[in-house]
Amino acid sequence: HPIVTEVLEESSESMDIIGFNYLTGRHLLEGELHPNKCVLGTETFPADIARLWKVVNSSKRVLGDFTWTGYDYLGEAGCGIFYYDGKSNFGSNYPDRTAYIGDIDLAGYRRPVSFLREIVYGLRKEPYIAVERVDKYGKKCSKTPWMLKDNIASWTWRGYEGKPAVVDVYSDAQEVELFLNGKSLGRKAAGEAHGFTASFETCYEPGVLEAVNYQDGRETGRHLLCTAGEEVLLHVAADQKELRADGEDLCFLTMHLCDAKGTPDLYGKRRIHIEVEGAGTLAAFGNADPQSVESYDAPCWETYDGYALAAVRAGGEKGEISVTIWMEGQEEQRQKILIPVNEK
């Protein structure tokens, strides 16, 4: 609008790179008005990435795009929570705690939108399957521009056998074919012209859900989701093999539920206990639940979408940290991790 252009003119003239928060309609226009300057999307909606990256690729003046946001955070509570009970976002709804709009959730787990972004950037050639929560099928939910879809990469929905399910496949290919237990559910167009997304509707049936990319009739990639078995196990992975005795160094312990074959179980819920002894302390423990009321320094948390995350901090003296982790009701399956703490 001419009035907006007039208001922005003074600040635009004073900068070499013009940055806009959410004014994405001006990215190309500013480049035309100021041909010797560059434009940058300094804060944009996650769901707009397919459209905005096309703008970046089509103009030498548009440098790139920063989404809001990469990692979830405490505050602006409820901005991205999917309400199915009539509540509105940004409504100060207790017990909302996090914004819940990060490509990566508070437990460090990548949400589906991050894989869509990876595909849009051209960094991933395999398709990616995300299933809209089957237990919420047909229910109306609130939504803000910071939200994409309430979906997760899971084909484990106990108790919902035969119930309708919506499957989204993110893909840069011309076509995507979806298979359920070897049976084709059809092919659909994908790629840039369709927002890098193809959606299928089926009914939940335990087994294997597989998506296949086709470019010019040739297969270019696959992605599959498998239903987790009934036995629920806990997998724990530490991101550090040793720490420095500086009172600050951290080791993050990622925990997720899985079956005996290692298939992630995002639908399962278990309470996890952690005990830290020796040359370090428990810095924090928690999950990505945006409405949890538990304390982040508590030694017991429930998984959320199958995941939890703990941070162990080294003390100021060399030695060894002993971390013991177990699921409630399965105390006999305790896992012990030893982390050496060496000199600074």
State where each predicted segment sits.
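Short beta-strand elements
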Residues: R222-G229, Q333-K344
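Short, hydrophobic beta-strand segments
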Residues: A198-Y204, D297-G316
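Short aromatic-acidic-glycine turn motif
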Residues: K188-A190, V232-H235, E275-Q291
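Exposed beta-strand face motif in extracellular beta-rich ectodomains
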Residues: E205-L209, C251, E317-I321
